């Protein structure tokens, strides 16, 4: 399998990197929200089961 090389202008590359960075930050934020939601659900389950 051969690979073709493509030249990407520096400003386009920087834009792509910036977009990737913003996606990584958004992903981290969503992971944190999910962990908080999991903790909240666990607390609700404890209350529902009368173990709190």
UniProtKB/Swiss-Prot annotation:
One of its GO terms (biological process) is symbiont-mediated suppression of host innate immune response. Keywords: Host-virus interaction, Inhibition of host innate immune response by virus, Viral immunoevasion. Plays a role in the inhibition of the host RecBCD complex (also called exonuclease V). A double mutation in this protein and the nucleotide kinase gp1.7 protein allows phage to overcome the retron Ec48 bacteriophage defense system. Overexpression of the wild-type gp5.9 protein in E.coli with an intact Ec48 retron leads to a dramatic decrease in cell counts consistent with cell death, the L23P mutant does not have this effect. This is Probable RecBCD inhibitor gp5.9.
């Amino acid at each position: 399998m051969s690979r073709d090389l493509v030249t990407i202008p520096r400003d386009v590359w920087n834009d792509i990197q910036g977009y990737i960075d913003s996606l990584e930050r958004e992903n981290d934020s969503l992971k944190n929200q999910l962990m908080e939601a999991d903790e909240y659900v666990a607390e609700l389950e404890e209350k529902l089961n009368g173990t709190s």
